[in-house]
């Protein structure tokens, strides 16, 4: 491993908060079959020198651009070398007062995450490959002084190389554009780390809740060849950690010049192809009919006998989607299927207490009184059925029995709400808590607001207001977005999305000062949600399927700290970005909506262009864009099992931009 011997290069960053920045520089050189040798570097004008002659020449350049310093390093080989460059920039901030930010992967200290994932629980210093991050930036916020410090990589044209081994010292098999970013707190003073090519330490995060030995890679330069790597270093101020994330996201978005891709499909073409999923996944022979949506083989897409009202299955929402589409496009088979799902669910999908059955494995039979419910799945089920009931009402049809069940379930919601306005994440059939944490509370806001509009019951609006009071105080004000998803309990993008969605719904049914409050809260949550979505296209090596397909990652979202892959979880968020952008004059949100809309349909499986999926219309879920996998196949591929139920539902909502506003315009 590299020996950590370093001297200091003093570089003056003439920011608005000007001060000298201490940068420690190291060069690692490796010869095949031998341990690497590390050299500390000192600054001599434009050169970086070691205490002895080196087979390389290293030049540095500093260019002031407003309040930032652009720091470039060029390494030129005198003979063939295998090198690794490392830099550490001291912030002067005491670690105890610092929270860190690596977009889409690290928030605060990642203390909501288990010790088996990267967090301060296992180490206070980490380095990560850039493709783990939704933007190639490392930042720190000092809550004692409100000062901030960031290092951002200026990207090279994308290149990637397959690696013969994944840990230890590794000579790369070809060119890569990937460096690394991170932070170091070993001295009690926070420093940001960066370099090229990538290294990951003290551990690599290789799959869910699995840390592995570190890796340091070395890039080859032949005699006369050179490589230039550039970073932007900036200091600033922010009112809070959330404000720091907002400012960093704005700066990154502007600097990267994020633009939509050339979309391969129109919205109508996407929906027409997704209908193949509706037809091929339809399952009968059980008390409830449904579209098989989870635990499905990527290779065969064979249906599996499990039903999920929400979360990964989204069975009720997909039932409404196909019913509505079939009616509009004269496809009676889809209308029949959608009606059969909802009709059978009305008959068999509710428990004795009036809850929806969250999840049913029909091989084991119907759930009993021991069933555990989640506020998220109950909320997603009500959301789907209220859309269905409003649609039917507009067609002149009523469903009194189903309305009564939904009305009763919303009454249960009101009774479950805690004094602080929150809802338990999970609870028993008798209403007692299984997981009393309030991170999923904003899931309940949406059905409460919809129920208020549909049933004209003001109790539901009162309860919804109380959820936002909790949301503001306990989640948005603290920038503590966690535990919205059900397959992890950590910092995750879905928590920020749900917070933005909840406040969006409240804004739609309010006016004046109250509406302005909700718009402000929505915007704060939306910036945080936006930070999870890629603003750049990660590189792939030849032979990695995603790269061979020409896949571009911009607009796709990292899932959570635990699940370091990207996916199409967006649902209404894209429309919320557009709406917020127009309401608050934030053009970046409008642009991000365009990026998402153009990008998230790229992997649509169609006849003759299946994108690695067994059947047309089954949209992929676990898209592995970095050296992390859910258990199989690695970077550039999918996991072997997937849940297309929710991916289809998410894309359907993405390409149905007026659905929510039309619901509230209906009577």
Residue ranges: model-predicted function:
Residues 21-45, 221, 225, 239-308, ...:
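Low-complexity, Ser/Thr/Pro/Gly-enriched N-terminal "stalk/linker" regions
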Residues 50, 62-223:
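Beta-strand/loop-rich accessory regions of lumenal/periplasmic or secreted enzymes
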Residues 316-332, 380-398, 443-457, 498-514, ...:
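Well-ordered alpha-helical scaffold segments within catalytic/enzyme domains
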Residues 10-18:
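Hydrophobic h-region of N-terminal signal peptides that target proteins for export
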Residues 283-308, 354-377, 422-443, 480-502, ...:
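Carbohydrate-binding/catalytic loop surfaces
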Residues 1-8:
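Sec-dependent signal peptide recognition
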Residues 267-301, 333-356, 402-424, 458-482, ...:
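Long, well-ordered core segments of solenoidal/helical folds
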Residues 469-481, 485, 510-638, 658-667:
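Non-catalytic carbohydrate-binding regions of carbohydrate-active enzymes
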């Amino acid at each position: 491993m590299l020996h950590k011997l370093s001297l200091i290069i003093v570089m003056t960053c003439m920011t608005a908060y000007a001060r000298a920045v201490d940068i420690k520089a190291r060069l690692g050189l490796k010869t095949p079959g031998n341990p690497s040798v590390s050299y500390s570097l000192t600054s001599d004008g434009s050169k970086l020198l070691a205490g002895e002659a080196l087979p390389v020449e290293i030049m540095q350049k500093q260019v002031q651009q407003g309040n930032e310093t652009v720091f470039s390093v060029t390494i030129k080989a005198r003979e063939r070398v295998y090198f690794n460059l490392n830099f550490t920039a001291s912030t002067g901030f005491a670690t105890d007062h610092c929270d860190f930010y690596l977009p889409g992967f690290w928030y605060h200290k990642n203390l909501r995450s288990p010790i088996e994932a990267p967090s301060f629980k296992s180490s206070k210093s980490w380095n990560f490959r850039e493709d783990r991050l939704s933007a190639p930036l490392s930042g720190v916020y000092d809550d004692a002084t409100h000062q901030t410090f960031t290092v951002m990589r200026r990207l090279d044209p994308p290149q990637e190389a397959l690696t013969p081994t994944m840990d230890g010292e590794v000579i790369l098999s070809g060119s890569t554009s990937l460096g690394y970013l991170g932070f170091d707190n070993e001295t009690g003073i926070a420093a940001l780390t960066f370099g090229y090519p990538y290294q990951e330490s003290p551990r690599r995060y290789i799959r869910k809740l699995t840390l592995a030995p570190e890796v340091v890679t070395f890039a080859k330069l032949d005699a006369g060849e050179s490589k230039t790597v550039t970073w932007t270093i900036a200091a600033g101020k922010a009112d809070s950690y959330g404000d720091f994330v907002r400012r960093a996201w704005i700066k990154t978005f502007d600097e990267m010049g994020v633009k939509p891709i050339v979309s391969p499909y129109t919205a109508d073409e996407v929906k027409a192809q997704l209908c193949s999923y509706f037809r091929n996944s339809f399952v009968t022979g059980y008390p409830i009919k449904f579209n098989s949506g989870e635990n499905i083989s990527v290779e065969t897409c064979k249906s599996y006998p499990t039903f999920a009202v929400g979360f990964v299955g989204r069975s009720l929402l997909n039932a409404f989607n196909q019913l509505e589409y079939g009616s509009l496009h004269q496809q009676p088979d889809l209308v029949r299927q959608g009606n059969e799902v909802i009709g059978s669910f009305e008959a068999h999908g509710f428990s004795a207490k009036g809850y929806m059955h969250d999840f049913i494995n029909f091989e084991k039979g119907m759930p009993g009184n021991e069933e555990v419910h989640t506020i998220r799945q109950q909320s997603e089920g009500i959301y789907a059925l209220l859309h269905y009931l409003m649609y039917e009402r507009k067609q002149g049809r009523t469903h009194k029995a189903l309305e009564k069940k939904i009305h009763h379930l919303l009454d249960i919601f009101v009774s479950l709400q805690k004094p602080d306005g929150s809802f338990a994440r999970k609870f028993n059939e008798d209403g007692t808590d299984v997981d009393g944490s309030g991170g999923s509370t904003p899931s309940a806001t949406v059905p409460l607001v919809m129920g208020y509009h549909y049933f004209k019951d003001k109790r539901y609006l009162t309860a919804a207001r109380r959820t936002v009071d909790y949301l503001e105080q306990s989640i948005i004000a603290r920038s503590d977005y966690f535990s919205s998803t059900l397959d992890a309990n950590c910092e995750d993008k879905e928590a920020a999305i749900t917070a933005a969605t909840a406040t969006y719904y409240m804004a739609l049914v309010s006016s004046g000062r109250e509406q302005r409050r909700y718009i402000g809260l929505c915007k704060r949550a939306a910036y945080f949600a936006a930070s999870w979505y890629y603003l750049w296209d990660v590189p792939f090596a030849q032979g990695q399927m995603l790269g061979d397909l020409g896949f571009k990652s911009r607009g796709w979202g990292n899932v959570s700290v635990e699940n370091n892959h990207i996916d199409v979880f967006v649902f209404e968020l894209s429309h919320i970005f557009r709406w917020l952008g127009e309401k608050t004059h934030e053009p970046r949100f409008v642009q991000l909506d365009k990026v998402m809309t153009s990008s998230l349909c790229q992997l649509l499986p169609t006849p003759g262009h299946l994108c690695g999926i067994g059947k047309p219309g089954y949209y992929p879920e676990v898209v592995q864009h970095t050296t992390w996998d859910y258990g199989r196949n690695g970077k550039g591929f999918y996991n072997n099992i997937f849940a297309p139920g929710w991916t289809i539902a998410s894309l359907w909502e993405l390409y149905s931009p007026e659905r929510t506003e039309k619901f509230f315009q209906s009577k």
